Design a protein with these regions (language model features):
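Metal-cofactor-dependent catalytic cores
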Residues: 1-276
């Protein structure tokens, strides 16, 4: 088999919204530049995601030199400019973590509140914000638990072969997609090099109901697919369902689509039960 290569790089500036495909990217300690650097919360500061507000996956963002441009169904275009952010910081909650986050503006709050029909606020991972990966001295953005997620195309193909209706890779929201490897080969990788960056695979990624939300329609699958099928062959002893690998970057540097994936070291893969 040919060398494994990086085939897609995606950053998700706003947690739970559409990703942006990149040809090349700067990788920092927190992951891809800008990835999950914005979060939407309720009025108490608790984070909101596509798990409960699936329409978020239909929010499209484009990166500009001064901020972001947002579009969503039925909404006017919104321009987000860093220079217009407030200087106010407030504690927000992402899972069990409290993070001091920079409030952006009332205008952006109102835009998302109107779109979701739910009162909410919009925050940025500002220069005074700090969060770390649980158990590691490693900076983290508003991502669920780790800075980066990697999945191979072969693994998705193996899943889709078991599904009546195949799903797109976007439904799993990876940052890095690789090809030209065996299905679930990434389960056994420990350290890899892509471009200028060495990555450590920390753990497999536990999957939730968000994977059942169609990235085009914004609707949740009534049969809870692909999660129901994944459960049949990717459930571990802890009863969690895993698909993809969580990574941390061991140094800053650039990566680009087409880069070779060098497998530096391996470790024993997680074991999974198989059911009919």
């Amino acid at each position: 088999m040919s060398s494994t290569i990086l085939t897609n790089v995606t950053t998700y500036p706003i947690k739970s919204t559409q990703g942006i495909s990149l040809n090349n990217a700067l990788v920092k300690e927190t992951g891809l530049e800008l990835d999950r650097h914005f979060v939407i919360t309720d009025l108490n500061g608790k984070f909101i995601t596509g798990r409960t507000k699936s329409a978020l996956v239909l929010v499209n963002s484009n990166i500009t030199a001064t901020g972001l441009i947002l579009n969503a169904p039925g909404m006017p275009e919104l321009r987000i400019t860093y220079n217009n952010f407030s200087n106010k910081y407030q504690n927000v909650q992402v899972w069990n973590d409290e993070i001091s986050a920079q409030h952006c503006s009332n205008e952006i709050d109102q835009w998302f509140s109107m779109y979701l029909n739910f009162s909410c606020r919009f925050y940025y991972l500002g220069e005074h914000s700090h969060r770390e990966v649980k158990g590691l001295d490693h900076k983290l953005s508003f991502a669920d638990g780790y800075p980066l997620l990697l999945i191979s195309e072969a693994s998705l193909e193996a899943l889709n072969a078991k599904l009546e209706h195949p799903v797109a890779m976007a439904q799993f929201r990876p940052n890095l997609v690789v090809s030209q490897c065996l299905e679930f080969a990434e389960d056994g990788w420990h350290k890899i090099r892509i471009g200028e960056v060495v990555f450590e695979i920390v753990k497999p990624c536990s999957r939730c109901i968000f994977t059942t939300v169609n990235e085009i329609t914004g609707k949740r699958n009534k049969q809870k697919e692909p999660l129901s099928t994944l459960k049949k062959f990717r459930q571990a002893k802890d009863k969690e369902i895993y698909f993809g690998q969580n990574l941390i970057a061991l140094n800053e540097g650039s990566i680009k689509v087409g880069d070779k994936v060098e497998i530096i070291s391996k470790h024993p893969p997680q074991e999974y039960s198989v059911s009919n």
